[in-house]
Amino acid sequence: ESKMNKGDSKIMKTVYTCFCTDVIHEGHLNIIEQAHKYGRVVVGALSDEALIRYNRFPTISFDERIRMYQELEGVDEVIVQDTIMYDDVIKKLKPDYVVHGDNWREGAESVIRENVLSLLSEYGGELIEVPYTYNEEVKKIDSTLKEKLAMPEYRRKRLKQLIKMCPVVKTIEAHSGLTGLIAEKTVVEENG
């Protein structure tokens, strides 16, 4: 059964976006608002395993994240995205549009963006990039989450999750706050 746009006889188009967050802020709401202008909004909830492999560790359960996304105004459906790459979702859903912040044009996420563009080009889907929202509120939320994840109980939880998921876990030992900070902030980009 297709949803119809209010006052419109056309079948609504499908718009897909993926979230990998435990806290909804202005930027996420902006993504939903922009996506809703184009049609029926389907939000992909990145699974815990995909989040952890992407080096983002959840502070709330997967079910809580799904409920949080479902309760957002403008979201029509929430599905699971099992990998950081969009292949399975795009091949199955064939969205007319994928909406994402423009922050993935450079850096490590640019590979994901290029993959999405390639998948969409196979059937005429379009990528809509929304200017990334980065203001004081967003900075504060990011900072609070980083502080929370730095707490020993969350670090132990992350290590247990990694050991459970991966047969080989890469770790680095740090003997001071400074070396710990260096280890935490180090990013290796391959082929870029």
Regions found by a protein language model. Give the residues of each.
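Short amphipathic alpha-helices and their capping/turn segments at secondary-structure boundaries
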Residues: 28-37, 180-191
